[in-house]
């Protein structure tokens, strides 16, 4: 069970709505994934309606919004500050989310530049601390630097969310050692965020010790979102079970292979016995 800021979720998979090509495909993917928490950029929200049915850029005019869809499916909304590049903008966005959606949860994103979409870790830690002081439960998107991850935890983050690789690249986990180190040192949930391309990436994240995986593009931009969402659901669970089971130690060529069965009792040719028989 995944627990963040005192709230428990059966699913360890968090979905994103970015990149969805249609509301119908998004709904099918969300249902197939089994997710109970999904992140939505606050820039999708239209002021004037705090019922969760505000219009969004991903829905047809007059149709159901992403917020309405999540509400109908019983999925918790995790508003994010996607697109923000300063502490001031991120804090304002978080405040608007709390007012509009009635939640003090926020996924904090502070982007350094539009080309790489890498997080601005210098601004990130201070912003996290300010949001925590205002009563927010901050889930902080960060780099795969273990030092920054620890500083975010010290600043009060409810969860740290290191990237596997840059957003939308599908490159998987480029630095598994750092992700494993972040997990080993953390006392809050570590959620892999960004860079997942296929199910094996999600499984690896869990094997490295992550508490959960957040992904969007890998599902929403693939050829069959519902099928990929199903694959991700099973991959996260498989990785979690494998981590709990404990993998066997890896052996180098110098150490040699290790037989799974003893050589004791192995049949061998006996000349004396052969002469008697033959």
Swiss-Prot record:
Cellular localization per UniProt: Cytoplasm
Gene Ontology terms for molecular function: thiazole synthase activity
Pathway: Cofactor biosynthesis; thiamine diphosphate biosynthesis
Keywords of this entry: Cytoplasm, Schiff base, Thiamine biosynthesis, Transferase
Class in the EC hierarchy, top level: transferase
Active-site residues annotated for this sequence: 107 (schiff-base intermediate with dxp)
Record EC number: 2.8.1.10
Pfam families from the UniProt entry: ThiG
Record flagged with keyword Zinc-finger: no
GO cellular component: a single term: cytoplasm
UniProt catalytic activity: [ThiS sulfur-carrier protein]-C-terminal-Gly-aminoethanethioate + 2-iminoacetate + 1-deoxy-D-xylulose 5-phosphate = [ThiS sulfur-carrier protein]-C-terminal Gly-Gly + 2-[(2R,5Z)-2-carboxy-4-methylthiazol-5(2H)-ylidene]ethyl phosphate + 2 H2O + H(+)
Any GO BP: thiamine diphosphate biosynthetic process
Binding annotation for 1-deoxy-D-xylulose 5-phosphate: 168, 194-195, 216-217
Main location: cytoplasm
Superkingdom in the source lineage: Bacteria
Protein task: Catalyzes the rearrangement of 1-deoxy-D-xylulose 5-phosphate (DXP) to produce the thiazole phosphate moiety of thiamine. Sulfur is provided by the thiocarboxylate moiety of the carrier protein ThiS. In vitro, sulfur can be provided by H(2)S.
Subunit field text: Homotetramer. Forms heterodimers with either ThiH or ThiS.
Similarity comment: family membership: Belongs to the ThiG family.
Name of this chain's protein: Thiazole synthase
Organism field: Corynebacterium urealyticum (strain ATCC 43042 / DSM 7109)
Gene: thiG
